[in-house]
Amino acid sequence: MKNNNFNFIFLHVKILAGGIMFKNTLDNKRYYTLNYFFKMKFGQKVFKVPIDINSTCPNQVNGGCIYCSNKSTASISDGNLDILEQFENGKKIMEQKWPDSLYIPYFQSGTNTYNDKNLVKNYVDKLLLLPKVVGIDIATRPDCLTEEWLDYLDELNKKTFLIVELGLQSSNNNTLNFINRGHNNEVFKDAVKKLHERNIFVVAHIINGLPYETKEDMLNTIKFVNDCGIDGIKIHMLYVAKNTPLASIYEKDKFHILTKEEYIDIVCDQLRLLNQDIVIMRITGDPTLDELIAPDWLIKKFVVLNDIDKEMVKRNIYQGDLL
């Protein structure tokens, strides 16, 4: 069941001289942007501020996911700092350009529902007392949602706007096994169902370009998350990070890594298959320079974003136009 405890805004379409596209007066994209969603929900600019509470991951005992470097991509948070200090540091950066913006603390690093619930609750309570904080975002794994945690998330969702982000990466169970993900796609589907029973906004993380996956596999992942009824999605491009099992595999095998052109083509086709009411919260990866082995084109994030926009205009396509 889709959540109904917030004012969900559907994108509208309009006819233009060049064809059909989304009516999005903020940034004129052809897909449902997070910026637009936040603007419609809260009436002004909203930023997510990364928070690191040193959460670990239960899958680490089994070696962890093969691509994991135990770093958050492009995170401005520092797990050695007090959470209020982390939040203020992130907020100051945004305030320089957008002084009137609102904020959602984002528990980004690690598996946060694998942490002590009372510790997390204490952090959340402190953050919700701060001015301009309008919600909480918690990242976790679909296999780390106990009934105790679900009860707490249900309670939290009744207090504020809550986002729960779940890593899926691929709907192909053979791929999930190869990357040592530690769960199958049914676990993800069940987690989404349990969160939606509590009217919680659910975001899926997927990765394009996982070793030996075909374009069909990546499109099937989109069809799978559509069927799960997710509310938002983050689409990442696989990158090889230093000091990871994936780096060792890449050094020996040199498996194919998507070119920028291949990635853009796949993302455009994925967006066409994605329900129009799903918010696109991320559409490319954002690795740090010091850990990146390949692909080097991923460093230029805004070039990739602009090229996706250009390709959608060129092909006269938009999110969900094949549904």
Residue ranges and their predicted role:
Residues F22-Y36, M40-F47, G232, V240-L323:
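Auxiliary Fe-S-binding modules of radical SAM enzymes
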Residues I20-I104:
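N-terminal [4Fe-4S]-dependent radical SAM core
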Residues K71-G90, M94-K117, K132-L145, F161-F188, ...:
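Core AdoMet radical
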